[in-house]
């Protein structure tokens, strides 16, 4: 049922892209050759570098270093390794998947663009099936998954491709030589260390690697300076989902509920005045003083496949006065958001049928940042590209998710069947020659980013970043000089729908 993008591809190329030919690529006795990883544990010549007045060890010397193990970064690492590059993936947590796993952002929204699934995205969905998680509900096009299963799948994909994962490693800084990054500095469980690489991919979501290297960037809405609001998502267990379904779909006759358990969701969005039936319930809570207007503004919940009686809560939406790009404000948002979370949960337990025995079973390990920093790259995507449904010869994916700018009075949709494309040039900058940026922090305006930020699109961008990194290294082409449309079609994850309109 999922969207699928098909390109002509030779069997051998397909095997390389899906990791079947990855075995044996990482060999310690050939450090320095393409497709190898040299680690401090088995290669003394990795040595040390001087940083901040002291010598620190070099943990890895690799072809490609990816910072950030979210949807984009994981895809980039897997595809770089599958295409022959020795690859290290840095992740600050203890699981890959980013917001999908650590942030409770669930499920994957649909791009609404026909044939948008690139091979990597289609593979993730198929692997969910192989693990007993059917991602489609038969009605909607969103991808239902299971966070813990998804983390396992990403581990498996990295292991099969030969990606070295460095968990609990926080990116600290970069080391530059001219217009190239030569190493990044990370804080590990053992202290500061360096990773040398020929090409670096920023999958941090916050453009941290790019900013540390001196790439130009911007943040927030050009008109107000505000970031999109943060969320502090959580899960609730002990829910009688069938009772909840009967109440919402039968008693309230909420026609918005298209699917039924085990695939079921509820929602209300008072701030958008969409007149969901549950808005009345939340409004009564405001009137009685049980919850605040801020807490009642937005509430959404989804059942989680493989977790009976558990729902993923897409709330609270933290007020826009808290910033995703200010460390002090962000920290205060955590405290404020947790209070909102408990108020909402307590109110639902008291007032929403089916929640009588519910409880908070898990809170996200990171806030949900919809938007923070974005690079200024060789092509700057704007809302004009959205409205014009722009096509590019170097397009790496397509999407049609609506302009979903929380906190601003902006919400627009393309006509059915419409879409725009994202060019490779939006992933690279003029200033840093061996840097590729993947995910929600690519070169785009605030409004356009509100459309391309969803996880399947970020996966496709990361997929292309990994392919491009490996291809450029194999031909000694700088990352910011790569012509995506010069890569043979059979090796690309996406081929533009048509010649560029611009």
Residues covered by each model-derived region:
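A short, basic/flexible loop-to-alpha-helix module at the beginning of a structural domain
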Residues: 46-61
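N-terminal secretory signal peptides
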Residues: 1-13, 35-38
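Conserved N-terminal/central alpha/beta ligand/cofactor-binding core
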Residues: 5, 17-19, 79, 85-86, ...
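N-terminal export leaders
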Residues: 11-18, 23, 27
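N-terminal Rossmann-fold NAD(P) dinucleotide-binding loop
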Residues: 73
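Conserved beta-strand-loop-beta-strand element in the redox core of flavoprotein oxidoreductases
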Residues: 175-194
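Beta1/beta-strand and adjacent pyrophosphate-binding region of the FAD-binding site
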Residues: 59-70
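Flavin (FAD/FMN)-binding glycine-rich loop and adjacent Rossmann-like elements that form
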Residues: 192-199, 203-501
